[in-house]
C-alpha cells in the first residue's frame, strides 16, 4: 500500500550507507574521527559520543551505525569512504539508480531531516534486497549485540543492543525468522522500519514509513510477513525464482525486460502488480577446442580478493 509514495526515510537511510561501506572498504580499516563526524552529535540525535581524534575500526563503526543508529558515525563513514561527504552522497545516489530506485534522493549518510532527502517504501526494499546479497551486510544488519572495545580516547567498552522490535529476542514484537533490519525516526518522517525475514528458503522484505510508533510499524510488518508466507509460493522462472500467489502459475505472469546496472533483468507482473525481478543469465559461449591443455599451469593461482574476504571475518 502506497509503496511508491515519496516520504522521508530517516535512519533507514543508513542501509545504503552500510552497503556502500562494505562494498568499498575493509572492515579492518581504521577510521579517524574528525569534526565532520562529531558535529552531528546532539542530545536528541542517535550517537555513541565519539571525539575528534578518536580511532575506531570500520567494523565497529558499522555495528554502531546499524545497532545504535549513530549519526556521527554515519557522517564519518561517509568522509572515510567517499573522501568527502558530498562525494559519498553522490555515490549513494548513483548506487540507488543502479539498483533500480526511481524516487529516491539522498543528501546525507544518516537520514537527518532535509527537504531534498527522500525515498519510497519500494525503493528502500530494493536497497535492502541488494544489501542482503552481500555476506558482510547480512551479518551486520542482523546483529542484535556488539561490544566496541576501548579506543585511544575512551577507556570503557561501548555495549550496543538492537532496538529493532522484530529482531530483539526479548521484544514482544519479535518475529520468528527475522534476519535483520533498521529502524528510523524523526518528527518529520515519523517512524520508519525496514525488516527482512526468511522462512523455508524464502526471504521477504517489509518497509513501513510514517508510522505513529514502532509498535504500529512492527504490527503492520508482521501482518505483511504472515500474509506473504501464507498466500504466496515460489515459482521457477528463467534465471531464478519469484513469489506468486497460491494457485498462480508462471503462465499467468507477464514479463517486462529492462536493463539494470548493465545487466538484463526480467520483471514479473501479475495483474499489473510487480511480483519480483530476476537477472537473466548470460548465454554460455561454446568453448573453443583446447590446443594444449597440459601446458596450462595457471590453475594453482588463488584469487587475492577471495583471500582477503576469508581473512576479513568478525574478530
Please annotate each region the language model reported.
Residues 101-102, 113-315:
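Domain-terminus/edge residues, biased toward the C-terminal soluble/receptor-binding domains
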Residues 1-122, 126-135:
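Active-site-adjacent loops and short helices of periplasmic peptidoglycan-processing enzymes
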Amino acid at each position: 500500500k502506497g509503496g511508491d509514495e515519496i516520504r522521508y526515510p530517516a535512519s533507514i537511510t543508513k542501509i545504503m550507507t552500510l552497503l556502500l561501506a562494505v562494498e568499498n572498504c575493509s572492515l579492518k580499516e581504521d577510521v579517524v574521527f574528525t569534526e565532520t563526524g562529531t558535529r552531528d552529535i546532539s542530545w536528541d540525535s542517535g550517537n555513541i559520543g565519539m571525539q575528534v581524534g578518536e580511532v575506531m575500526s570500520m567494523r565497529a563503526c558499522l555495528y554502531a551505525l546499524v545497532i545504535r543508529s549513530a549519526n556521527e558515525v554515519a557522517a564519518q563513514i561517509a568522509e572515510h569512504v567517499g573522501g568527502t561527504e558530498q562525494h559519498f552522497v553522490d555515490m549513494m545516489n548513483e548506487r540507488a539508480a543502479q539498483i533500480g530506485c526511481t524516487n529516491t534522493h539522498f543528501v546525507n549518510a544518516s537520514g537527518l531531516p532535509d527537504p531534498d532527502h527522500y525515498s519510497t517504501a519500494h525503493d528502500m526494499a530494493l536497497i535492502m534486497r541488494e544489501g542482503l546479497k552481500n555476506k558482510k551486510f547480512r551479518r551486520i544488519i542482523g546483529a542484535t549485540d556488539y561490544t566496541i572495545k576501548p579506543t585511544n580516547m575512551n577507556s570503557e567498552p561501548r555495549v550496543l543492543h538492537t532496538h529493532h522490535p522484530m529482531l530483539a529476542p526479548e521484544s514482544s514484537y519479535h518475529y520468528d525468522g527475522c534476519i535483520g533490519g533498521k529502524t528510523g525516526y524523526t518528527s518529520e518522517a515519523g517512524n520508519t522500519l525496514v525488516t527482512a525475514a526468511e522462512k523455508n528458503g524464502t526471504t521477504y522484505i517489509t518497509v513501513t514509513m510514517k508510522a505513529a510508533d514502532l509498535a504500529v510499524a512492527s504490527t503492520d510488518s508482521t501482518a505483511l510477513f504472515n500474509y506473504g508466507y501464507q498466500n504466496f509460493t515460489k515459482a521457477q522462472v528463467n534465471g531464478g525464482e519469484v513469489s506468486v500467489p497460491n494457485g498462480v502459475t508462471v503462465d499467468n505472469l507477464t514479463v517486462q525486460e529492462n536493463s539494470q546496472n548493465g545487466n538484463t533483468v526480467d520483471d514479473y507482473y501479475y495483474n499489473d502488480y510487480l511480483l519480483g525481478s530476476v537477472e537473466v543469465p548470460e548465454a554460455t559461449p561454446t568453448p573453443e577446442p583446447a590446443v594444449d591443455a597440459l601446458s596450462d599451469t595457471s590453475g594453482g593461482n588463488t584469487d587475492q580478493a577471495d583471500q582477503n574476504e576469508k581473512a576479513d571475518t568478525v574478530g
